[in-house]
């Protein structure tokens, strides 16, 4: 597995992998970079805006919960959706039209990230009929933290986290 291979390599710049809310690597000896991605497919198929927004919110939360809290610095996304020109007659029963899903997931990810003040720096969109009714909505966030704060399990009850969006 990827986890086993990474652990066998035992690189000193891999500070926190497969044990906390996100993977952390040493960037320059003083700063560490962390990254987390996940999918939010079914929720986005049912309610595109909310499903995608909460998918992005989950990875932002995981960055904040890594070690002693990283600062989110950017978001990324990949959307795989059904063909946008599909006729409504071709839709499976209960499926939303791919155009509606696309507009909703795009707006959900954009709104959530923008309101938090975290830019989306890249993304991709793939249209294929196989994603009709079952989109792939892949969201990710990167963060930065001091190397000393990258180890898991150092939080204490009563610690406070303050996050303000714009």
Per-range role (PLM):
Residues 1-166:
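Long, structured ligand/cofactor-binding scaffold of large enzymes
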């Amino acid at each position: 597995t990827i986890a086993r291979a990474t652990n066998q390599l035992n690189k000193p710049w891999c500070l926190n992998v497969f044990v906390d809310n996100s993977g952390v690597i040493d960037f320059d000896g003083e700063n560490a970079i962390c990254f987390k991605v996940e999918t939010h497919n079914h929720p986005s198929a049912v309610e595109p805006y909310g499903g995608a927004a909460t998918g992005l919110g989950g990875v932002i939360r995981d960055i904040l919960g890594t070690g002693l809290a990283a600062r989110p610095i950017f978001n990324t996304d990949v959307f795989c959706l059904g063909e946008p020109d599909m006729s409504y007659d071709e839709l499976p029963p209960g499926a939303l039209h791919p155009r509606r899903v696309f507009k909703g997931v795009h707006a959900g990810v954009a709104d959530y990230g923008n309101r938090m003040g975290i830019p989306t720096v890249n993304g991709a969109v793939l249209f294929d009929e196989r994603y009709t009714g079952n989109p792939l909505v892949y969201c990710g966030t990167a963060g930065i933290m001091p190397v000393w704060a990258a180890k898991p399990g150092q939080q204490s009850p009563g610690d406070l986290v303050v996050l303000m969006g714009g």
